[in-house]
């Protein structure tokens, strides 16, 4: 099984280049002001400009305005948007632009209802629930809650590490795994050794 790897919360072009050299399939930048991994517009553009053809660039947003989304599409031109907030299907679909929809795994969540009507060409990313944080929790959820039978690309996030990613893949069989804090030396600072080790553990 050829599982892909997304390194999210990249904060410098150098980190993006290091991650790609290590074998990352996707590079994520966070355009959400409340995140410790948030980058400004120009820096996001600089990071995305380093992304090679064949590697996806992903712009993560949380409850952004319509005008901001159009600005991201026009000026950053990411491969995918990633909606990680409380955005409705109507909101996400209106841009007619490829996107990933993040689903935060609240305890009482019904997954089939949560994904309904989203035209998420990039798939659905399942992340841990936190009532204050939109992603980046560093906490894993119960992977057994995810559907075994599915007709969409499943991206697994939430508390992944170099140590647990093999178990995660064996349990969930995801299309892609997504990591941020699990390969950092401090918030927003990716550790090249951990990035390389994580990718080796996924693809090795």
Where do the PLM segments sit?
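Conserved N-terminal beta1-alpha1 strand-loop-helix module at the mouth
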Residues: 1-204
């Amino acid at each position: 099984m050829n599982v892909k790897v997304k390194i999210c919360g990249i904060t410098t072009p150098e980190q993006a280049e290091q991650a790609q050299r290590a074998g990352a399939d996707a590079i994520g930048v966070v355009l959400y002001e409340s995140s410790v991994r948030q980058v400004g517009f120009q820096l996001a553009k600089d990071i995305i400009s380093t992304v090679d053809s064949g590697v996806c660039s992903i712009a993560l947003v949380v409850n952004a305005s319509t005008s901001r989304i159009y600005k991201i599409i026009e000026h950053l031109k990411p491969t995918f948007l990633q909606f990680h907030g409380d955005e409705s299907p109507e909101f996400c679909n209106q841009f007619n632009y490829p996107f990933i929809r993040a689903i935060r795994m609240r305890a009482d969540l019904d997954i089939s209802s949560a994904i309904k009507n989203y035209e998420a060409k990039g798939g659905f990313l399942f992340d841990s629930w936190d009532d204050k944080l939109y992603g980046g929790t560093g906490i894993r959820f119960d992977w057994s809650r995810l559907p075994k039978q599915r007709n969409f690309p499943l991206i697994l996030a939430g508390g992944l590490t170099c140590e647990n990613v093999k178990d995660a893949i064996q349990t969930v069989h995801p299309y892609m795994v997504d990591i941020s804090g699990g390969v950092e030396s401090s918030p927003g600072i990716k550790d090249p050794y951990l990035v390389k080790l994580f990718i080796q553990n996924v693809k090795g």
